[in-house]
């Protein structure tokens, strides 16, 4: 046996452990422990053999420490307490012929979320405790092979961290229940959870000019069923699908953001990229997972922007098989999501809110499931004046500016066009001030020198530079479709 090789392997194992290369360190430790074991078998002197056994025991303890570090690092990735090694003297005696008593599970009622006056949806009961353990649930029971004291320490530490975070955020003492993604890929669940708009987009109804009919319908579809659950039953059940149709820039996405802010429901903002995957069968699984999560976090609003890109007309020559499967799964889930139709409880409803600029490309079956189809038109004269006030409320206006006169000149402009006009006009004074100045002189300008009021000439000049983005032929096409398929 080469003693120099044993020393070299032990040295490398310790060096790799100090450098953080724990996998290589464990390999060297295992090798040197086996070499010492074989060397001890060849020794005849008891004193020498005892010394080598002591060296082997010390290296074995070092190996266990490295292994414990690796286990701790893995536990951080798995989001659960690490599995520390337990010595034999700490392990109670167990008779292999006798089953141990069952470990009592902790039954904690899930706290309320979003609305304090509504009942919290209970956790899913159809998933076993074993499946919950695979995904590292927060309500996971402690394993019998862990020390009880360590489990108590981790639970107490977790409660302290949560309490500290709630105090810092000004939140309530309750924690939001987590969706149990057993049976689904963890990455898919996390991708959809990122699409939950947990923080308000800060868009209110007052920030949207005009569109009173659309606001009224959305309040009726989302807010009123939560306020009057006893009324919205049977034939009065809430609408399970609303489609907003109109030319670009008329405020469809703004209405969806206002729903997320004002209505107090869980809001999923979904796009075509969210429900698309390169792997076969995964897109359909994403659609099914989306609606299962929506039912769990109900009441929920699922907003699908540009829905024509996901569920266009089926049966065309250029349709791909994978696209057809996704459309079929979406139609099935929407038909089975009927909110009050399923559980007769409007507070557990799931509503699909969709927006499109090409309603004529939408599949007929999807059009039927989107029960309310409303037209979001170009703003009226009153709406254009309100939009000018909203867009220019943060800047100073010259006294000669009359927004009603500017609104009359913007007939045929969309809301986005009017916003662009206001933005361009607010930059006119800055452009005049920095004209002909060097970069050093521009940087030396004070904020007060740039805060010049917006004049009537600035708005008229911006109006000449920016043309309409919607043609009369497009408007006629939308109005014709609404006459044939509208349901306001």
UniProtKB/Swiss-Prot annotation:
Effect recorded for residue 286 to V: Males are infertile and show a significant reduction in the number of spermatids in testis, due to premature exfoliation of spermatids from the seminiferous epithelium. Sertoli cells contain reduced numbers of stable microtubules
GO BP term (any one): microtubule severing
Single Gene Ontology MF annotation: ATP binding
Binding site for ATP: 246-253
Role noted for this protein: Regulates microtubule dynamics in Sertoli cells, a process that is essential for spermiogenesis and male fertility. Severs microtubules in an ATP-dependent manner, promoting rapid reorganization of cellular microtubule arrays. Has microtubule-severing activity in vitro.
Name of this protein: Katanin p60 ATPase-containing subunit A-like 1
Residues modified as Phosphoserine: 172
Residues where N-acetylmethionine is found: 1
EC number: 5.6.1.1
Reaction catalysed by this enzyme: n ATP + n H2O + a microtubule = n ADP + n phosphate + (n+1) alpha/beta tubulin heterodimers
InterPro entries in the record: AAA+_ATPase (IPR003593), AAA_lid_3 (IPR041569), ATPase_AAA_core (IPR003959), ATPase_AAA_CS (IPR003960), KATNA1 (IPR028596), KATNA1_MIT (IPR048611), Katnal1_chordates (IPR028594), KTNA1_AAA_dom (IPR048612)
Keyword Transcription regulation: no
